[in-house]
Amino acid sequence: MQEKATLKRYGIFLVGVLICAMGIAFLSRSALGTSPLSSVSFVLYLATDVSAGLYTFACNMLFLAVDVILTRRFGWMQWLQIPATFVFSLCIDLWLAVIPTQLNGPLSLKVLYLILGCPIMALGITLEVLANVTILPGEGIVKTLAAKGGWEFGNVKVAFDCTLTAIASIIAFLTFGRLNGVGIGTLVSALAVGQLVKLYSRCIKRSAARRAGGGAVQ
């Protein structure tokens, strides 16, 4: 019974990763700017012939390495982040191949992609957290920095996202002479995704409470 529950949690996590990657792909293909966490990887992808997934994997492995240095431990949670990141990176490349870019598309479709991307990405993150199996290195490093510095997770997350966006913007300016891959969509996703995750989490908790109450009555 316990093994079945564990497998279910892993399944939920994998579905969450797949959905989160889809949301990121919609944001990236909107041509309005990708998510802050994916900004460096996506700008490098636009500037070279290397896939976004490969850059995503490399960036996340860097985050994991810093996490290990700061915590001085490499347990099963860290080990799990490696295959999880691999699947996540693969899913990003998959969705980018399937979802057409709106670089030269009408503004209405760009906005539609942005509107789709934020809630889809938030749903994926919510499922990843709900599964409680492991976390991706991009979130893990923020958690570690917050714990080490005694700061609030939310504040560190904002600072981390701003830092990545700034780095991506510098790379874009040096490579293209303008912002490319970073834009209003990056700002919107930074503001919206966290709030949507909170909303989804509350809905899931209420649903679970209702089911538990119904079970108790029966």
Model-derived features: where do they sit?
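Core subunits and conserved enzymes of cellular information-processing
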Residues: 1-218
